UniProtKB/Swiss-Prot annotation:
Keywords: Cell cycle, Cell division, Coiled coil, Cytoplasm, Cytoskeleton, Microtubule, Mitosis
Plastid as UniProt keyword: no
Function as written in the Swiss-Prot or TrEMBL entry: Involved in microtubules reorganization during spindle and phragmoplast development. Required for gamma-tubulin localization during mitosis.
Cysteine pairs bridged by disulfides in the record: none
Pfam families: HAUS-augmin3 (PF14932)
Protein name: AUGMIN subunit 3
Subcellular location(s) of the protein: Cytoplasm, Cytoskeleton, Spindle; Cytoplasm, Cytoskeleton, Phragmoplast
Cellular component terms per the entry's GO annotation: HAUS complex; microtubule; nucleus; phragmoplast; spindle
Record gene name: AUG3
Family membership noted in the UniProt record: Belongs to the HAUS3 family.
Taxonomic superkingdom: Eukaryota
Subunit structure: Part of the augmin complex composed of 8 subunits. The complex acts on microtubules and interacts with gamma-tubulin in spindles and the phragmoplast. Interacts with AUG1.
Annotated source species: Arabidopsis thaliana (Mouse-ear cress)
Amino acid sequence: MSSARLCSLVAELGYEGAGKLDPDSFEWPFQYDDARPILDWICSSLRPSNVLSLAELSLYEQFQRDGKLLEGDDLDQAYDSISAFSSRRNNQEAVFGAEESIKEVRDATLAHKAEALELQRQLRRLQTQYDLLTGQSSALIQGRRARVAATSAVSGQITAIEDSLSARNLQMNGVLGRLASTSQELAHYHSGEEDGIYLAYSDFHAYLAGDSACTKELNQWFAKQLDTGPYRLVAEEGKSKCSWVSLDDTSNMLRDLEKSQHQRVAELQRLRSIFGTSERQWIEAQVENAKQQAILLTLKSQVTSVEAHIHFDLHSLRRKHADLVEEISTLYQKEEKLLSETIPELCWELAQLQDTYILQGDYDLKVMRQELYISKQKVFINHLVNQLARHQFLKLACQLEKKNMLGAFSLLKVIESELQGYLSATRSRVGRCSALIQAASDVQEQGAVDDRDSFLHGVRDLLSIHSNTQAGLSTYVSAPAIIQQIVALQSDLSSLQSDLENSLPDDRNRCINELCTHIQNLQQLLFASSTTAQPILTPWPLMKELDEMGKINSKLSTAVEEVTLEHRNKREIVKHHAKDVELQRRVFVDFFCNPERLRNQVRELNALVRARQASSS
């Protein structure tokens, strides 16, 4: 809806101003959200039937000058003042045929107002319920988020515990692997299959390589610093004072000093004052290097002594190993001798003493082997028990997580059911509101036809009679609705004519053929000779069914007659009701628009009533 629509409606309604209306000048009120619905309602409600003409305005001003306007601030007080022009109650009843119609209108208005108030209360109650449901849903959502956060925290803790357990499992597997390898090495060592003995000792080669690299770097640095630049003079002077300098260096230094003794005295004094500490540092570095060399020599001597000791220990261990091998061989021989000679004799004697026969064999070896197997099996069983406990713990954690998820799922189902109920209730309320809106629009459309147009009123009454025979309700419709009803009647008439032209002749021919067939069958039954044909008797169950069918047909015909009578009565009631409603509307309109004509009608009715009373008396 825009200003152009408003200007066009005002022009159609007969606005006669100084000039043509400009839509752009009326565009600014439509830009506000508060004023737009009111302007839309005004544009949708503007019609020629509810707009006063110049004659009506002049009549309104005349009523206002004469003081003949209705008294009251609302419609109820206007209803009360409708019969104020008459002074006698009997006269009012004679004029209006009792005031029941006005009371009915007033009661209907009060009922509609009460229903509107009840609907408003229900709407407020639904709004409060909606707010409560919104708060509950928000609380449920927050609870679900808290549960999700707690579940994530618990899952994080479970993951951390699983990681720690897996790390401990790896450590345990490593320890078990080392134990297994150690047991294999011990078994291999005790088996006596290899004669070699392995010993571990400290290796100083890495230390020697690092020390040589450090010494090389120190020598390079000192050579770079003391052989070139001003440090060279300090180094030469320091070398002259050292007793461990070689003769070649001394002779070279003396030759250099003899050549340039006087030039370098001042330079040496200056450099000695500047670089006095460099000589001491270099000497300390040399001393430290000497100490490191001494430590290195000591370590080398220790390494040689350790190697000699290891060599000596190796030779001694080999000698001891040879002695042990000899002792073991003698022990094997003694064992074989005992197993072959002494033990069988002792077993035989023991069997004779106990009256039993004991089989020969290495029982002690079997017992030791069984103990070894049992210990390994215990270790493996402990490992399996730990694995089983870990799996049980994980299973319990999964069950708890599944339980929490099922609880959350059930909670979501409850929320969904509540939301579905609320949605259905909201939809039903929306349907009722739309029905009320439609009813309000229908009520607004009842007075859409101009009251002064008698032709449209007649057409509308005819159509309402036809529609009341079908729907049973009397309504006032607008001109477009009248056109739609006329079009619908035309379509019904065309469909009935097509049925009359197409389907009815076929049905008539089919009925005629069936009647001819029945007549032929009856003729055959009636005129057949007694010698050639026997009478066909109807079975007893069929006779009972035919009697029941006859009773039902009689009841059906009675019901059809009652329905037809009710339809006729209803048509009469609807016909008189339409006349009464038309009379009421005409009286109401004349009261506001043409009260003089209403007074004349009242006088005529009074005269008619008096004449009838006189004739009856």
